[in-house]
Amino acid sequence: MFQFEITSNCSNTDARTGIFHTPNGQVNTPRFMPVGTLGTVKGISSKQLTSTGSEMILSNTFHLHLQPGEKLVKESGGIHKFMNWPKPILTDSGGYQVFSLAKLNNISDKGVEFKNPRDGSHVFLSPEKVMQIQMDLGSDVAMAFDHCPPHTANENDIEDSLLRTHSWLQKCVETHQKSNQALFGIIQGGKYPRLREYSAKFTSSFDLPGIAVGGVSVGEAVEEIHSVINYIPKFLPINKPRYLMGIGSLREISLAVAKGFDIFDCVLPTRLGRHGTAFFNDQRLNLRNARFKNDFSPIDKTCKCETCKSYSRAYLHHLIRNDEILGLTLISLHNIAHLIRFTNAISNAIKDNCFTIDFAPWKTASIAHHTW
């Protein structure tokens, strides 16, 4: 039911193209996943999201558990029907909330007790509970519960969190009983090569349908991000989809693809969109700036997204300056489409054996006959 098929390899790098087959369709890799934390990519309908070329989205177990609750989602027919998204969905386990809500939680080997950020009530999540929630949600891919420590933690503390993550993974594997849902394990270990290698080998030993690298892009220096991207792939199974969590910048995606990663997610395109910032090649345009007031060109003349086909920078500037919700939606749509387009261009370059680690498809010399 779940299969990862490698369709081409790059002779210049370790990049590859592939197809991840799921019960709700296939995901062509390399692929960027938009983030729909609460069962929605903020401000964007499922139909609009389809127009960007998105093939798989991410939702969050922790937040859906708090509201509206996994039982209600299950009663509706599952997460796909609930949000009217017929394509693959991956649910994050809530491990990131262990990190982001650190001041509101108490961690033990049994699980995490949170103070509900909505109403202050106590919520306990164990590995077993997290698996049950994701099975009830009915996502295509469920992530194992992990402990993501802050990047400032010392080596001993990160090793403790790593051992806890491994213990939780064993419990997740024992609990997960859904044949039409793939379970991915998560590698932790911070900036320490010894811990990353140990975690990669331990997680790979379970022979799960896919494997993820977590604890990246959580506030650390970009050099540390690149170090993990460069170091860890040699310890990962070749025949599994490799998911690098929390990465959404073009430079890091290009580097990660060159090292053999396949799937990425990040809130960046929609977060920037909600603040009026649009992607343009490898730049960011702040459409609030007065210089766009009389600019009647689209964000990107070469982009085929619904925003660029229909609206000017001047109109988007007007919407943003007046706090119109439509402006946030249109810019977010473009930003998602831009990242999907970028990974599509990478895929074409890999197939034509002209992909490089500093891939920049908007530069004619980089893409030969390819269009951008």
Swiss-Prot record:
It comes from the Bacteria. Keywords: Glycosyltransferase, Metal-binding, Queuosine biosynthesis, Transferase, tRNA processing, Zinc. Zn(2+) binds at residues 303, 305, 308, 334. Its EC number is 2.4.2.29. GO terms for biological process: queuosine biosynthetic process; tRNA wobble guanine modification; tRNA-guanine transglycosylation. It catalyses: 7-aminomethyl-7-carbaguanine + guanosine(34) in tRNA = 7-aminomethyl-7-carbaguanosine(34) in tRNA + guanine. The keyword Transferase applies. The keyword Glycosyltransferase applies. Residues 246-252, 270-274 are annotated as: RNA binding. GO terms for molecular function: metal ion binding; tRNA-guanosine(34) queuine transglycosylase activity. Signal peptide: none annotated. Substrate binds at residues 92-96, 146, 188, 215. Pfam families: TGT (PF01702). GO terms for cellular component: cytosol. Its cofactor is Zn(2+). Pathway: tRNA modification; tRNA-queuosine biosynthesis. Binds 1 zinc ion per subunit. The active site is at residues 92, 265. Belongs to the queuine tRNA-ribosyltransferase family. Homodimer. Within each dimer, one monomer is responsible for RNA recognition and catalysis, while the other monomer binds to the replacement base PreQ1. Catalyzes the base-exchange of a guanine (G) residue with the queuine precursor 7-aminomethyl-7-deazaguanine (PreQ1) at position 34 (anticodon wobble position) in tRNAs with GU(N) anticodons (tRNA-Asp, -Asn, -His and -Tyr). Catalysis occurs through a double-displacement mechanism. The nucleophile active site attacks the C1' of nucleotide 34 to detach the guanine base from the RNA, forming a covalent enzyme-RNA intermediate. The proton acceptor active site deprotonates the incoming PreQ1, allowing a nucleophilic attack on the C1' of the ribose to form the product. This is Queuine tRNA-ribosyltransferase. It comes from Prochlorococcus marinus (strain MIT 9312).
